[in-house]
A protein has these predicted regions:
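A cross-family kinase active-site recognition segment
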Residues: 1-43, 63-65, 173
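Active-site cores enriched in adjacent His and Asp/Glu residues with nearby glycine-rich loops
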Residues: 42, 67-69, 141
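A structural signal for short hydrophobic/aromatic patches embedded in well-ordered alpha helices
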Residues: 48, 128, 145-146
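Active-site acidic catalytic loop and adjacent metal/ATP-binding pocket
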Residues: 53-100
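Active-site activation/catalytic loop segments of kinase-like enzymes and analogous catalytic loops
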Residues: 99-136, 153-168
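All-alpha amphipathic helical-bundle segments outside canonical DNA-binding/catalytic cores
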Residues: 140-150
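Regulatory N- and C-terminal appendages and interdomain linkers associated
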Residues: 176-180
């Protein structure tokens, strides 16, 4: 949380703007581009459309924003002795809500695998938020929006993985992440 907050404070001073290509506004076109009929996830389409509609209805307006990394997933960060030691892959960096970044982190880093299920780890969320707030305070408006921001972040990653799964040729030399 601390390094993310520091990154947000530093980038807030930059006079740069780049639209977040994976913002909530981009999820509907992404959803429409998934070939549901041709893969084993065809029953998800209705569920995903309804969820996106609901997320859009409750998506917050005018939260504090600036440049975010936009992809703080486990394969883009390094830890040394349980401390964040490095961040890479700024391909998806762009302007969006700072709390959307925290929602991405919650989705990526605050679950534990128990058997075959991922279980939310509230202590990890608490540590992430406390670390962030030790550097940059989170407003009550931001805190009240975190649930819908987390839903949006989760949907974003599910949709990108479904897109890759349904649209990438089998001969492509890339590793496709399992949408499950």
């Amino acid at each position: 949380g601390k390094i993310t907050a520091r990154m947000h404070l530093v980038t807030k001073k930059l006079k740069l703007y780049r639209k977040n290509s994976m913002s909530i506004k981009n999820l509907n076109p992404l959803l429409k581009s998934i070939k549901f009929k041709s893969n084993k996830f065809s029953k998800l389409e209705f569920f995903l459309k309804n969820n996106l509609k609901d997320i859009n209805r409750y998506w917050p307006k005018n939260l504090p924003n600036g440049i975010i990394h936009g992809d703080l997933f486990i394969d883009n960060i390094f830890f040394k002795k349980n401390k964040l030691s490095g961040i890479l892959d700024f391909y998806f960096a762009g302007n969006d809500y700072f709390m959307y970044e925290i929602a991405i982190c919650i989705n990526a880093l605050c679950f534990d695998l128990k058997g075959k299920k991922f279980i939310i780890n509230k202590q990890k969320i608490k540590s992430l938020i406390e670390g962030y707030e030790s550097v940059k305070k989170i407003s009550s408006r931001e805190k009240s929006a975190i649930n819908v921001l987390c839903r949006g972040a989760a949907l974003r990653y599910l949709l990108t993985r479904l897109y890759d799964y349904s649209n990438t040729p089998k001969t492509a030399l890339i590793k496709i992440k399992n949408p499950n």
